[in-house]
From Swiss-Prot:
Biological role stated in the UniProt entry: RNA-binding component of the eukaryotic translation initiation factor 3 (eIF-3) complex, which is involved in protein synthesis of a specialized repertoire of mRNAs and, together with other initiation factors, stimulates binding of mRNA and methionyl-tRNAi to the 40S ribosome. The eIF-3 complex specifically targets and initiates translation of a subset of mRNAs involved in cell proliferation.
Pfam families: eIF2A, RRM_1
Cellular component GO terms, alphabetical: cytoplasmic stress granule; eukaryotic 43S preinitiation complex; eukaryotic 48S preinitiation complex; eukaryotic translation initiation factor 3 complex, eIF3e; eukaryotic translation initiation factor 3 complex, eIF3m; multi-eIF complex
Molecular function terms, GO-annotated: identical protein binding; RNA binding; translation initiation factor activity; translation initiation factor binding
Domain RRM, residue spans: 40-126
Organism: Aspergillus niger (strain ATCC MYA-4892 / CBS 513.88 / FGSC A1513)
Complex formation: Component of the eukaryotic translation initiation factor 3 (eIF-3) complex.
SUPFAM superfamilies linked: RNA-binding domain, RBD, Tricorn protease domain 2
Chain's gene name: prt1
Entry protein name: Eukaryotic translation initiation factor 3 subunit B
Amino acid sequence: MAPSFDTLTEQDLHEEEEEEIDFSDLKEQYEVKLEEGLDTFVVIDGLPVVPEESRQKLIKFLLRKLNTVGHTSEDAVFMPLNDKNMSEGFAFVEYETPEQAIAAVKQLHGVPLDKKHTLAVNKLMDIDRYGREGRIDEEYKPPTIEPFKEKEHLRSWLGDANARDQFALYRGDKVGVFWNNKSNPPENVVDRAHWTQLFVQWSPKGTYLASVHPQGVQLWGGPAFSKQKQFPHPFVQLVEFSPGESYLTTWSARPIQVEEGHPVLTYEEDGKNIIIWDIVTGKPLRSFVSHDLTAGPGGDGEPKKKVQWPAFKWSADEKYVARMQQHQSISIYELPRMNLLGKTSVKIDGVMDFEWSPATVVREGVKQYEQLLCFWTPEIGSNPARVALMSVPSKEIVRTRNLFNVSDVKLHWQSQGTYVCVKVDRHSKSKKSMATNLEIFRVREKGVPVEVVDSLKDTVINFAWEPNGGRFVAITTGEAPSGAAVLPKTSVSFFAPEKKGVSAGNFKVVRTIEKKTSNAIYWSPKGRFVVVATVHSQTNFDIDFWDMDFEGEKPEGEKDLAANLQLMKTVEHYGVTDIDWDPTGRYVVSSASVWTHSMENGYNIHTFAGQTLAEHPTDKFKQFIWRPRPPTLLSKEEQKQVRKNLREYSKEFDEEDKYAVDIANTAVVETRKRVLNEWAAWIRREKEMLAEEKDAYGVPEDVDSSKQAKDAPAVSEDQGETVVEEIVEEIIEENEEVIG
């Protein structure tokens, strides 16, 4: 019978009281914390010793400094006097909040009050905590020095005898790092379950592998991928490295809540979304609140917000980092102090986007150091849209260009900073049709001339410069009907400069391939080869491999251009979502991630020319990323010498490849020999057992078979002349014909 109130005993009532629901976690979360303690007090030391009649005057003078970091008053400053009615050289100050007290310690400690006196500011709680009797041992004891432990070599993978590359593979709940073995199965380096909660990311030079967790970010490295650094940022969602791996930016949609006594984070980070970290020390340099971008009206008419990422963009040499407040300004900070350059942001009305040059540029006629930054503003009232180049640290505008009838602008720097292409989407006066112009700034030339490429009649949906080169590819499309299930037809245009002596000539179309569905461009990191693909499609999966410097016959109409275009191969990869070149430009991986769809997930490895080496269907495949390599240490002369002797090196590499194949074939032959020996031994044993049974039952012995069993020779591994023949049948063609 089910228990009821009437059937409850006295013992049951007491048990109910004992088993009362525990609300302690909810109480802790929602409890109103009363202010208590001495967190709002600071102690100011290093003050002048003055008589009682001058004390008030000194307090008023001191308040000028104190109120620069918070709010306090004369009543909140206590300056004690001794028996001689003279001040003691220190004072107690109460601020309105603990955060103001922390700011006073950070910003006023060590600040001169006048020529003879320098302020020493400490929290009263710290003095109580560390200065209490018994906390400090008055007798000196030398510190314990830990025995030296040699650190792991963080770039050990570069010493691989076969110059192989590594990649990280995230599938299911496991993350592994593997060696690429071309067509052979990859060799595992490390494989761990639950290594990350969101994704993994390599640092730009491949030194660290970052894993993302609710508690923060961890960096791993060395031959065994041991833990190198930790960056506690609760509920972190995005990470970004600086180009030289010195700094790390982390972002979370949730404002940080710093608990008292946190070993790394302080009240300065409380309520912030973004932290910039020093990777070497593992400490935060500065924290910020997010600035969201507007992304057009939402369904309810309200403007949608999208995350501005990367929130901070780095100069090529890591000396500066900048962020944009859309429509208002660009703030440039100096590293490593993270102070605002010139103490003010650059006010730019309407600013929509900006990009640093990816390399330090030396402009013609300019001798002083500079980093270049490009930004654009839309049309405001009667003022045209504008693209400008700014020199940093001077903040001088070195080139501007006005634009009209602008719908959108995208900025594309060439990897060496030689060019910046401004992709301008223009609307007609009736605003019913769209077209794209390319405005190319020749940054290194005197006066920064601008070349306009207006041969494209449709809208450019993708654009990519050749790394370390002067060619580019653009994909265009007409206006697709909204809600169309079929991909719109696209055209792929290959551009190259004309041959004109030392300097590059104007950009001309090498060739345009029409009636495609391609929507993505992936250049080899070494240039020359480019993959043009259709990704994130449900119907088309073409991957085209192009060579821009084909060594065959050049068409007559393209002889004046610095290119010889050739389609090497087209392959298909069902459901392809991502394409990744390895850092040497030898291999390409196409992959289908479960993050996009759950059909036939996995990855395929191809050569640069499109030959498929291996297919790896992988259940719950999520992410494939090659490990980057640091820049080469060879000088330009040494690199030139290597290219000159490349044919000789190629012979050595071919011999090594042949030797590796021979070893693999030898292993197969040895395995087959072993299996054959085992089979022959089994036959011999069976025949001997059969002969013994016949003898036991009095069955006449077959002399020939017994003799054959005893005389059956073993296949020795030392017999070099043993030939193992394997017959493989393959159907070349099959025809079915109906007769009658």
